[in-house]
Each structure stands twice: as C-alpha cells, then as structure tokens.
Amino acid sequence: MIHNPILPGFNPDPCICRKGDDYYVAVSTFEWFPGIPIYHSKDLKHWELFTHVLTDDEKVNLKNLPSAKAIWAPCLTYNEQEDRFYVVYGVMNSMNARYFDVDNYLISAPSITGPWSEPVYLHSAGFDASILHDDDGRKYIVSLEWETRSGYEQPGVICLCEYDPAAQKIIGYPKRIWRGGTDRGCIEAPHLTKRGGYYYLMCAEGGTGYNHCVTMGRAKNVWGPYEGDPQNPIVTSAPGVSYERDDPDHLKPKYFNPDSLLQKSGHGSYVDLPTGETYLVHLCARPFIPELRCTLGRETSIQKMQWTDDGWLRMADGGRLAQVDVPESKLPDCPLPLLPEHDDFDAPTLLPYYLSLIHI
C-alpha cells in the first residue's frame, strides 16, 4: 500500500507529470526560496526531493512580499513532441481590498534540472494558471478570473486563452469557460488535459479549507461548452452536499469531517501510467483536534483512480473520500535510501532541503 501523505509537511498545490518511467510533482513555496521544489519517483510510492525550478533570485523578485504571497500553484507539464518541460506559476503580490494582484509566468527547460528559460509574462487576469499542449501543437492557458465586485460569486470563473510560443504572448483576452461542477463555490486550481477526444478540466472547489474538493468537467471543444461530472466532487474530505457559492471564505471549519484522517482534500492533478492505471495527487492537511490547527501545513497525498466506460474519472474504491492508504501501482518497486541524518555546513554544498525567506 501507499501511505499518505506521500509528501508530508509544507507541500501544497501539487501538480504531477510523467516522462517515460519518471514521475515528477511540483508544489508551491510562497515566499520561501529556492522556489518550486520538484519531487521525483519511479513507483509513485517512494519520493525524493530532486531539484528546484526557481534558484536565481534575479529571475524572480520575492523581496518585500508578505507571508503567504509570492509563488502560487505551479503547473508542471512535459511536452513529448518537444521533449521539453514547462512550468507555469503565479507571483502573488497582494491580496488587499478584495483585489488579488498576481502576475503569471511561463518558463521551460530541456531537462527537469534545467537550465530554465527566462520567465515569460502571460497575464494578470487571475491565479492558478496552467498550460495545455494540444495535439496540433497549439498551447492554451487556463486560469481563474478573479471577481472583485461585491455581490458577485467569489472568487470568480475559469477562463481560457491561447498562447503563442513564437511571439511569447497570449492571443486575445481570456474567455470564460466554466463556473464549477458543484455549488461549493470558491473555484480555483484549473488543470486542462486531453484524453480520448475530450478536453478535461479538473478544478478545486469549496475553498482550500474543510470543504475543499476535486471536480471535473469535459468538452469536445477546448472552448466548451463544458459538462460537469455527474458525480462531482470526485475526491474530497467532506462528501456531503453544500451550497456556498455566495461565501468567499476559504476555511469553512464547519465542514470538518471526523470520519476522515485527511482533511481539506482538493487541488488535484492526475497522471496516466503505461500500465493502464491512473493516479491523482492532491493537497490535504492533518489538523490537531479540537483546535483544527494544521501545524504541518498543507501536504500532498495520492489516490488511485480509474476511468469509467463513459469516460469519467473515479476513485478506484468507488467512493469520494480521500484515503490514507491506497493500492500500489503495477510499477516496479523502487525504494530510496534513508535521508541523511546530518549535514556538513563546512562542505562546499549543502543538502537541498533548506528554504529561506527572501522577502527582506
């Protein structure tokens, strides 16, 4: 069995991709540097910190940014046609006065270890941007359009625009394509993939708190219209029905589920294996009770999934509740050596596990 969380501690907003027999997960780092750690595995059970994407503070300026801002929700993809990795990420500058001031960027590299290109500015239309590499070579950026007007559903709606890699800029203005697959509100974290003739739009809903979940929509055309999965949400810690579209609060502790060891499960990303299996990574948390304080932060877990005959993604156990222990894949077992118990600060280089604040 695979025991969750696979990435314990501060590892939120996971995005998974595969190149050959190698699997990689990127997570958020906010104001901590170096930015965007990449974890590696060959069996989805044993994971190691492999590299960081943002290691040059000249390419990303995090100085003077407050806590919980800066690098949000990286989207890591591998384009097989180009044999190239892409990362789309946002730099959150401010969340004051209902307005989220965010700049979204794209970088790419021939290897997961780099060298990474200069950041290309995409837009500031919303956060949690990600990229789709379509079969015909075209590329699309999907993101959340932030709603600032009082009385409107918060935080907004999922939008799509095309990206021109030659000109290194988006084409036109983002078009609204999806308002969610449930009534939990607080839609975010869109990931767009293509499979079996459908464009699949995976999102998080309910806020990144106790009503968090993973939802799915699909369409035959990338611009829509998108239909929601009739079983939405497909993964969550709070499987009940709720209407929260008019509530911008993200925490929602009233939805704490005492029957779930993993709380706040949402913000997912899936990967298909050459064995015919599918797995989904998602963020989660393990709070102290009754205080509901998550001192380890938001962590990364994994769930075994399966595709139905009519093309929807389901948890392999037939439920929706995120599980602590999930079946292993058919991939060969690849255990890793134990982490070193000490580090030599007199050595030329240190182990890669250290982060530092760079906002001052």
Features from the language model and the residues they span:
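Carbohydrate-active catalytic/glycan-binding domains of CAZyme proteins
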Residues: 1-358
